[in-house]
Regions:
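Extracellular/periplasmic carbohydrate-active domains that bind, remodel
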Residues: 2, 7-493
Length: 493
């Protein structure tokens, strides 16, 4: 037998830094509202200088849980925080916000969430327990400048953090997270690690944040984005998202609940589907961001969208595998939606993007890779290396003749613009594009060119190999200057 002696001082520290919610009146039967008791435990813990609030095994029906600085909310294995239904009136009301014209209610309000914190330091949510959104709404009916309806007055996020510093979320699972399973806005020093999220709308949104790491996580979102860096106007100012690392993650678009139960039922491809996307909200922009060692399954592809006047600079994407991809495998665009005050918007900047070591199998025939600016404003300094894509194919001659519309001020979603006239790569309004060791294959014959480039200055293609139908052009160049093709099988009849 091994005996452990704990000093009186250590015993005092242990007894005063751990707070079990059961000791504050939490029942954990899934019927009684327990958030009042949990909030009492959090308040007492904070009054003692901080520590760990323990939620032991049980089902805890809750409205809004309010985090405080220096608190670790620990969900033990078997513990479930269950979101109350709207008619129970258990969620905090949304806070006042000076201007709702430039973002929807989901990005405007934080207090009407299942777990929320604002202006906090040193907070964490950890443990092997689960957050089950239950009664959270996933609707988004707020209109620009009119945030009534939809999620207002109900709970709409599982975890919402605003202007917090030194944040850790680790090991927990989230099911049915509402409009956002996790939304962090204006936060610094964020770690999200080993999370499992199975929800209907957005999984993880990192908005106007700095120094964030998302790692070793599985995020399933059949009807919205899985991991979505943004830089909205939710702080009533422009703020860039920068120094971001997303690594060792699996994103997917299976039906909600089928990631957790193991059945992995494919969801019908829709508006957006289980992807990693930068944007659409992009007032501040994105700088010094890395996505590495990630897997996309039954989802849309990677999207980099800069459309609200900010800057996108120094982005590296590497070591990515995609299978059963809808709509497109890679989408890089500069647009002019300019959702924000007129004195803060204008044409944005997209430059210095490196994408390498990408493998895509069974990509949709709607569109290949798209890299587009707008007339007079160019996407600049883009490198694609070691990219291998198997497309479904099946495009016809009419598709190949189609005049592809400019994005202009429209919402940047490729399927809204229709079938692309190139099956592999469409480039327009770009300066300095390098393609090295690129392979495009089609599972069925495709009568569209593999590559179309328009209004490009500085284009280098080296070791580019593509499938092409007999007698059809493999590439089309219009208004392309400083073109260099070598070691490639590209033909033009």
């Amino acid at each position: 037998m091994i005996s452990i002696n704990i000093s009186p001082l250590m015993a005092q520290i242990v007894s005063t830094s751990f707070f079990n919610v059961r000791n504050f009146g939490a029942v954990g039967d899934g019927k009684h509202l327990d958030h009042v008791a949990i909030n009492k435990a959090i308040t007492k813990c904070a009054e003692r200088g901080g520590g760990t609030v323990i939620v032991p095994s049980g089902n805890y029906l809750c409205g809004s849980i309010r985090l405080k600085s220096n608190i670790n909310l620990y969900l033990d294995a078997g513990a479930v925080i269950l979101g109350a239904q709207p008619e129970m009136n258990a969620y905090d009301p949304p806070e006042e916000f000076p201007d709702t014209a430039y973002q929807d209610g989901g990005h405007t309000y934080f207090h009407n969430s299942l777990i929320w914190g604002e202006n906090l330091k040193n907070i964490s949510i950890t443990g092997r327990g689960m957050i089950n959104g239950g009664g959270l709404t996933s609707k988004d009916k707020e209109h620009l400048g009119d945030p009534t309806g939809g999620s207002i007055g109900t709970g709409d996020k599982a975890i919402a953090l605003k202007l917090c510093t030194n944040v850790l979320i680790r090991d927990i699972s989230i099911f049915h997270g509402g409009h956002f399973a996790i939304l962090a806005t204006g936060c610094d020093l964020i770690t999200m690690d080993n999370l499992t999220i199975d929800t209907n709308r957005d999984g993880i949104d990192i908005d106007c944040c700095t120094n964030a790491v998302i790692s070793n996580s599985r995020v399933n979102c059949p009807n919205d984005d899985a991991i979505c860096p943004k830089s909205s106007y939710a702080l009533n100012r422009k703020q860039i998202t920068e120094n971001l690392l997303i690594t060792n993650c699996i994103v997917s678009g299976f039906k909600e609940g089928t990631l957790l139960n193991g059945t992995r039922i494919p969801a019908k491809a829709g508006w957006s589907n289980g992807r990693i996307k930068f944007g659409t909200e992009s007032n501040g922009g994105f700088r010094n961001c890395v996505v590495s060692n990630c897997v996309f399954k039954n989802s849309n592809g990677l999207a980099l969208e800069q459309v609200d006047g900010g800057i996108m600079d120094n982005i590296i994407i590497s070591n990515v595998i995609m299978t059963d991809v809808s709509h497109y495998p890679i989408y890089i665009t500069l647009g002019k939606r300019n959702r924000g005050p007129k004195n803060t918007t204008g044409m944005g900047i997209v430059k210095n993007i490196l994408i390498s070591n990408i493998r895509v199998d069974n990509a949709d025939s709607l569109s290949g890779i798209q890299i587009t600016g707008v007339p007079g404003y160019y996407v600049e300094n883009i490198q694609l290396r070691d990219v291998y894509i198997n497309y479904k194919g099946g495009g016809n001659k009419n598709d190949a003749k189609r005049i592809f519309p400019e994005l202009d001020g429209r919402y940047p979603e490729p399927f809204l613009l229709g079938v692309n006239p190139a099956y592999g790569l469409f480039v327009r309004h770009v300066k300095n594009l390098e393609l090295t060791n690129i392979r495009f294959q089609t599972l069925k014959p495709d009568l569209r060119p593999a590559i179309i480039c328009e209004d490009v200055d500085g284009l280098e293609l080296n070791y580019v190999k593509v499938s092409k139908a007999s007698g059809m052009d493999s590439y089309v160049m219009k208004n392309v200057k400083n073109l260099n093709i070598k070691n490639s099988n590209l033909q033009n009849y």
